[in-house]
């Protein structure tokens, strides 16, 4: 029978441990990790995501602030705000909520954030460090969450065949690298790949991040596989709208595999690791040893 990997439950445990670390930082060092989220425009989904992030941060005792800017805010003004936040020693994490309006250069904005405050892990400096195995950098939140969920099922991933479906800079590429550093044999599938079913059927681990509803068929997944579904797609069925993943979740009912649901799988882990990055970033910026905190969080 299918086993559900409950991302909400796993994230709750991670955040409980993180709360202990935050309390220690306050008591022993007088440090209150401080996250600032910048949102441009009034996209409803972005507002919802930002609200969730701020609420979770405050629940953990972090200082959290949102800077909400009008849709027509100039790129120059946004860059000026980021520069101020970079120079503010009391701010440990900066996140610019995506997507941005079309008149703003996303890459320019992301790379204007100080790498040590880039809690999304999207800055070119952090991407370069990750690509070369320097894992003391800010690592993107969703890929970290994927690995953590996989390890709730199987701790030692060495020698596992892993398939990543999707090659985005946000999920596909970084999660493939993290799996490689776990000594997996990694195959990345994309729009030009052939024989997708054949590759997936050989996989011990599948990470689906392609952004297409139910793209990965249940018949492509072998018994015993671990499946992490990063996709979140809004579909309309029988006159009702709901979110589904990139994996044919319903078809796995009788397949003996481990799979994350959508929603309630990867999403909570992404927010959890955003807060982890903020806390670890505060330690680094304040010269506080963080290895014991990191090991306690990722147990």
Curated annotation (Swiss-Prot):
It catalyses: (6R)-5,10-methylene-5,6,7,8-tetrahydrofolate + NADP(+) = (6R)-5,10-methenyltetrahydrofolate + NADPH; (6R)-5,10-methenyltetrahydrofolate + H2O = (6R)-10-formyltetrahydrofolate + H(+). InterPro entries: Aminoacid_DH-like_N_sf, NAD(P)-bd_dom_sf, THF_DH/CycHdrlase, THF_DH/CycHdrlase_cat_dom, THF_DH/CycHdrlase_CS, THF_DH/CycHdrlase_NAD-bd_dom. The gene is folD. GO terms for molecular function: methenyltetrahydrofolate cyclohydrolase activity; methylenetetrahydrofolate dehydrogenase (NADP+) activity. Pathway: One-carbon metabolism; tetrahydrofolate interconversion. Its EC number is 1.5.1.5, 3.5.4.9. NADP(+) binds at residues 166-168, 191, 232. One of its GO terms (biological process) is tetrahydrofolate interconversion. Homodimer. It comes from Anaplasma marginale (strain St. Maries). It holds the Pfam family THF_DHG_CYH. Belongs to the tetrahydrofolate dehydrogenase/cyclohydrolase family. Catalyzes the oxidation of 5,10-methylenetetrahydrofolate to 5,10-methenyltetrahydrofolate and then the hydrolysis of 5,10-methenyltetrahydrofolate to 10-formyltetrahydrofolate. This is Bifunctional protein FolD. GO terms for cellular component: cytosol. Keywords: Amino-acid biosynthesis, Histidine biosynthesis, Hydrolase, Methionine biosynthesis, Multifunctional enzyme, NADP, One-carbon metabolism, Oxidoreductase, Purine biosynthesis. It comes from the Bacteria.
């Amino acid at each position: 029978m299918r086993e559900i990997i409950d991302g909400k439950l796993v994230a709750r445990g991670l955040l409980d441990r993180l709360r202990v670390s935050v309390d220690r930082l306050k008591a022993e060092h007088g440090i209150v990790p401080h996250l600032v989220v910048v949102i441009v425009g009034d996209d409803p989904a972005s507002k919802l995501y930002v609200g969730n992030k701020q609420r979770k941060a405050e629940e953990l005792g972090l200082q959290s602030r949102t800077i909400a800017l009008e849709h027509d805010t100039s790129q120059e003004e946004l860059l000026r705000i980021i520069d101020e936040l970079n120079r503010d020693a009391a701010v440990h994490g900066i996140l610019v909520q995506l997507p941005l309006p079309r008149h703003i250069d996303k890459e320019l904005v992301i790379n204007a954030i100080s790498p040590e405050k880039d809690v999304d892990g999207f800055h070119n400096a952090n991407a370069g460090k990750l690509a070369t195995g320097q894992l003391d950098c800010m690592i993107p939140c969703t890929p970290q969450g994927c690995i953590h969920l996989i390890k709730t099922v199987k701790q030692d991933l060495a020698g596992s065949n892993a398939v990543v479906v999707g090659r985005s800079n946000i999920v596909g590429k970084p999660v493939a690298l993290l799996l490689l550093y776990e000594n997996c044999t990694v195959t990345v599938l994309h729009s030009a790949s052939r024989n997708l079913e054949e590759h997936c059927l050989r996989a011990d681990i599948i990470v689906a991040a392609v952004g297409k509803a139910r793209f990965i068929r249940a018949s492509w997944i072998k018994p015993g596989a671990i499946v992490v579904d990063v996709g979140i797609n809004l579909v309309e069925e029988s006159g009702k709208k709901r979110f589904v993943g990139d994996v044919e979740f319903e078809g796995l009912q009788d397949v003996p595999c481990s799979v994350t649901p959508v929603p309630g799988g990867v999403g909570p882990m992404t927010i959890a690791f955003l807060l982890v990055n903020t806390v670890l970033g505060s330690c680094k910026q304040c010269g506080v040893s963080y290895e014991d905190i990191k090991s306690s969080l990722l147990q």
